[in-house]
């Protein structure tokens, strides 16, 4: 064996040790049973978890904060600010900022990242070139997927449609969309139709920003579900945000959730950013624009959580830590029972792996050795304590170790 991890625990608290050979888990054993290896790690009683997955992010505008302050705090102003500066972004700048993000993410235990890339008549393919260069630059640290994201619309923008086709020829892995950015539901339907046409041509999955508003008028999620079933794209479609769901009445929400389940659509909730952006136009009681996470989970829908933005005009905070995102999601979605906390913990892990189609993901013999060791014994502890100490392993190779220490300067 190349690597043995001793004195660890499974995510349910059982003492275990792992053997890894050629980047694959080849043994999951009870303590003190595996032979010596070329390299050994003492997990010190920590949980051996599969590494985290960041499923909804925007690499190109991460860390764009200085001088670009969103005074109103609204999504609309954030989009306006970004539209004014996106044409000035260089490949070198995007790669440099992406590197800071990637290194932070990896040190926190994230080994997969899906980034939406703005494709429009302003930036054309310049941003894609930058993010694609970043993907190549950091390929030894993290797997990055790129989503062609037409934030400024498709239905009335033939140039953007052409750019989307070109984006798929120039490195994008998935087709994105933002149908609620159109002016009417009819145009939203056209937007969705265009996205599916492109996805079917290239036989790729779809990941759209859906109903990122607290206006109950918007229900493009329903259109997306209908189109998914119509085209046979079940299991291959993801809907991010879904904020308007919180403004629908219960009957409407239940009907559309049933359609989402039937279409096997994955839902990504971006609780930190949407709780910051939504409700800005309302008095009290003030909506917070969070998808109905609990109802979706109860219906059997696969729910994932995502960071979305980091220290920019859309969101001034964030640590690129899926544990923080899961904790905030648990708060805002009222996930407080033990099984609900476990569901929140699984959102950037097993739920995300299902969305990505990572079938060799986990801690079992034959799985790829992509792991994070956490100073916690259970899901509840992981979310409560947000442990700083973490060891990150990619394909059987130790990438990072973080060891924080508290020093007491008191006699007792």
State what each model feature region is.
Residues 62-94, 171-174, 202, 220-238, ...:
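Active-site gating loops and adjacent loop-to-helix segments of metal-dependent hydrolytic enzymes
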Residues 354, 365-412:
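C-terminal cap of metal-dependent C-N hydrolases
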Residues 205, 226-237, 273, 277, ...:
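His/Asp/Glu-enriched, well-ordered alpha-helical/loop segment
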Residues 65-116, 122-137, 162-169:
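Alpha-helical scaffold segments that flank or form the walls of functional sites
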Residues 1-49:
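Histidine-rich, glycine-flanked metal-binding segment
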Residues 46-68, 213-214:
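Di-metal (Zn2+ and/or Mg2+/Mn2+) metal-binding site signature of metallo-dependent hydrolases
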Residues 126-140, 156-266, 282-305, 361:
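Histidine/acidic residue-rich metal-binding segments in metalloenzymes
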Residues 8, 23, 45, 56, ...:
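Divalent metal-coordination and catalytic microenvironments
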């Amino acid at each position: 064996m190349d690597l043995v991890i001793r004195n660890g625990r499974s995510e349910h608290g059982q003492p275990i040790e792992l053997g890894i050979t050629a980047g694959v888990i080849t043994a999951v054993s009870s303590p003190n049973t595996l032979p010596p290896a070329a390299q050994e790690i003492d997990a010190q009683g920590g949980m051996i978890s599969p590494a985290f997955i960041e499923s909804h992010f925007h690499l190109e505008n991460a860390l764009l904060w200085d001088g670009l302050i969103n005074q109103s705090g609204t999504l609309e102003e954030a989009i306006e600010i970004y539209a004014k500066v996106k044409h000035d972004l260089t490949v070198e700048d995007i790669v440099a900022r992406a590197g800071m993000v990637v290194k932070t993410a990896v040190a926190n235990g994230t080994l997969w990242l899906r980034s939406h890339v703005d494709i429009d008549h302003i930036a054309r393919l310049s941003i894609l070139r930058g993010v694609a260069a970043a993907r190549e630059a950091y390929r030894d640290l993290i797997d990055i997927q790129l989503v062609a994201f037409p934030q400024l619309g498709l239905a009335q923008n033939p140039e953007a449609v052409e750019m989307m086709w070109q984006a798929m020829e120039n490195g994008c892995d998935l087709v994105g969309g933002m149908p609620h950015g159109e002016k009417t539901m009819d145009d939203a339907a056209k937007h969705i139709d265009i996205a599916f046409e492109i996805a079917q041509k290239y036989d790729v999955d779809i990941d759209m920003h859906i109903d990122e508003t607290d206006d109950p008028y918007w229900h493009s999620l329903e259109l997306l579900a209908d189109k998914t079933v119509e085209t046979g794209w079940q299991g291959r479609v993801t809907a991010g945000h879904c904020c308007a769901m919180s403004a629908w009445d219960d009957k409407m929400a239940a009907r559309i959730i049933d359609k989402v389940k039937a279409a096997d659509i994955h839902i990504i909730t971006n609780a930190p950013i949407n709780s910051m952006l939504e409700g800005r136009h309302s008095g009290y009681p003030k909506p917070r624009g969070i998808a109905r996470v609990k109802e979706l989970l109860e219906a059997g829908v696969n729910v994932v959580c995502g960071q979305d933005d980091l220290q920019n005009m859309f969101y001034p905070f964030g640590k690129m830590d899926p544990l923080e995102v899961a904790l905030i999601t648990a708060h805002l979605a009222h996930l407080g029972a033990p099984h609900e906390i476990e569901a929140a913990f699984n959102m950037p892990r097993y739920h995300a792996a299902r969305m990505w189609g990572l079938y060799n993901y986990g801690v079992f013999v034959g799985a790829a050795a992509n792991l994070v060791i956490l100073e916690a014994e259970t899901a509840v502890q992981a979310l409560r304590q947000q442990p700083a100490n973490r060891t990150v392993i990619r394909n059987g190779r130790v990438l990072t170790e973080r060891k924080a220490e508290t020093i007491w300067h008191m006699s007792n």
